[in-house]
């Protein structure tokens, strides 16, 4: 099942008990965050606040608040089915010619999906049913959440920022938080390595002093939103990838003020520009780390046009100490990463990003070990293979007899198969999340790899221990007589 717009997905969630409408008046200032946080931590539904205080536009939160809803957005029933998305990405990252007739037949579904890649331009799009320009532009009329007591101002959180670099054929979609400055200005917080910032940098080099056109889409269809947070190959547009996931082309339309293409069924579109000479201090804001971040200067986005659907819905979220919505997205996208990593490193059995690790700061990898030093090779490969993992501070590698998603198993492996000096690899002066205030320098810090695998000759000269396992004959015998023993069922430790 695919969803043409956000509204059809909302209807689907509501029919399946995954969305709750809140008619009671709730304030976007702090109150929505507290309610959403309580509901998310209990595994509850998405919430549609129909009567936000001092506003007429409904607010949608916790849309991707469980891995199940992320899977539902992509037409899947189970988060594990998201590995199919990873298999598609692995195919796109390293497309190989068929090795024979049978291989060609097997790859036909992939080639069919590729035909859905180019976006489809439509006229009279829903996102331009209402057009506001000049003095009509008023960002304060939107029910923008003020999430935490220490936040400096309301914050746009789920906007898809659309840019195009002068050296790129494709447009880029990225999600960058945006601080409300005034009725027509936001601060665009994009970090230097992100696609939008790189496009802007290239534009300034080729067009010094000129205004850079930017568009922000709010409330796009769920597949396009998820396409913007998935590790799409740099050469591919997120629109094209969304078409692959959806099984049909992404509908776009031309923005009113520039040539950028926007998702046609979006709820709200903000059009405008960035003046290369205009910056402002952003923050502080509570972030996904569970702390307020430092302030820093970023470009100012001046909004010249607001277009939206009739009876538009404002899509929002908050970030805080995990679990939050980004952490739940990370749990779901974890399944996407597994096939991509296996494509490059077939010895990988499983890969896990624990949500407590702020989505990506810690990873645990289980491998089928084949030679001394193998774990360290996998660590270095993971850090360098995908852009998402350059911020991963800690990687633990375990053997295939250890469940990398079970902390009891992982801690047992660390404490019994590791020597702290021999099996710890430290790498300094590496890229680190700018929000990580624990690093010595903003954006630059160290990484730690922990080899918790069994050690091979060459890694140790000692006789290595053999895990204790009861023989199958005895276990079967006890299974047979268990009920006769009169021992009540006991809780699992």
UniProtKB/Swiss-Prot annotation:
GO terms for biological process: ubiquinone biosynthetic process. The keyword Manganese applies. Catalyzes the decarboxylation of 3-octaprenyl-4-hydroxy benzoate to 2-octaprenylphenol, an intermediate step in ubiquinone biosynthesis. Its EC number is 4.1.1.98. It catalyses: a 4-hydroxy-3-(all-trans-polyprenyl)benzoate + H(+) = a 2-(all-trans-polyprenyl)phenol + CO2. SUPFAM superfamilies: FMN-binding split barrel (SSF50475), UbiD C-terminal domain-like (SSF143968). This is 3-octaprenyl-4-hydroxybenzoate carboxy-lyase. NCBIfam families: PRK10922.1 (NF008175), UbiD family decarboxylase (TIGR00148).
């Amino acid at each position: 099942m695919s969803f043409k717009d956000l509204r059809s997905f909302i209807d689907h969630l509501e029919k399946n008990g995954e969305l709750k409408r809140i008619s009671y008046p709730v304030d976007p200032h702090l109150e929505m965050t507290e309610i959403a946080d309580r509901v998310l931590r209990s595994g509850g539904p998405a919430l549609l606040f129909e009567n936000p205080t001092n506003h007429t536009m409904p607010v949608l939160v916790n849309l991707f608040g469980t891995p199940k809803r992320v899977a539902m957005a992509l037409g899947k029933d189970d988060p594990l089915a998201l590995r199919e998305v990873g298999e598609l990405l692995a195919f796109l990252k390293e497309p190989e010619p068929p090795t024979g007739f049978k291989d060609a037949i097997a790859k036909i579904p992939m080639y069919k999906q590729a035909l859905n890649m180019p976006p489809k331009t439509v006229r009279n799009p829903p996102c331009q049913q209402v057009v506001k320009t000049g003095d009509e532009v008023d960002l304060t009329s939107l029910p923008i959440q003020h999430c935490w007591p220490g936040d400096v101002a309301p914050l746009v959180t789920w906007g898809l920022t659309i840019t195009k670099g002068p050296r790129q054929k494709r447009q880029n979609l990225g999600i960058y938080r945006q601080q409300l400055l005034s009725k027509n200005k936001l601060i665009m917080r994009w970090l230097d390595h992100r696609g939008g910032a790189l496009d802007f940098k290239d534009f300034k080099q080729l067009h010094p002093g000129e205004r850079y056109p930017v568009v922000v889409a709010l409330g796009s269809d769920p597949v396009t939103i998820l396409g913007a947070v998935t590790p799409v190959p740099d050469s591919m547009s997120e629109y094209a990838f969304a078409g692959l996931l959806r099984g049909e082309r992404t509908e776009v339309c031309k923005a009113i003020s520039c040539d950028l293409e926007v998702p046609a069924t979006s709820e709200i579109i903000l059009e405008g520009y960035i003046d290369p000479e205009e910056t402002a201090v952003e923050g502080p804001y509570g972030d996904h780390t569970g702390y307020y971040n430092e302030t820093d200067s970023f470009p100012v986005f001046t909004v010249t046009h607001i277009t939206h659907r009739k009876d538009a819905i404002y899509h929002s979220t908050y970030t805080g100490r995990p679990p939050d919505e980004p952490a739940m997205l990370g749990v779901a996208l974890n399944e996407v990463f597994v096939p991509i990593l296996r494509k490059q490193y077939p010895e990988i059995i499983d890969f896990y990003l624990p949500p407590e690790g702020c989505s990506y700061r810690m990873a645990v990898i289980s491998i089928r070990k084949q030679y001394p030093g193998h774990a360290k090779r996998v660590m270095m490969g993971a850090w360098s293979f995908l852009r998402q993992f350059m911020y991963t501070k800690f990687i633990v590698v375990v053997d295939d007899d250890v469940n990398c998603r079970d902390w009891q198993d992982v801690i047992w492996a660390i404490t019994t198969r590791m020597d702290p000096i021999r099996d710890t690899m430290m790498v300094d002066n590496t890229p680190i999340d700018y929000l990580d205030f624990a690093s010595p320098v903003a954006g630059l810090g160290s990484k730690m790899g922990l080899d918790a695998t069994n050690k091979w000759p060459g890694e140790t000269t000692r006789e290595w221990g053999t895990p204790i396992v009861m023989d199958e004959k005895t276990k079967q015998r006890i299974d047979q007589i268990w009920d006769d023993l009169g021992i009540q069922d006991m809780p699992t430790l």
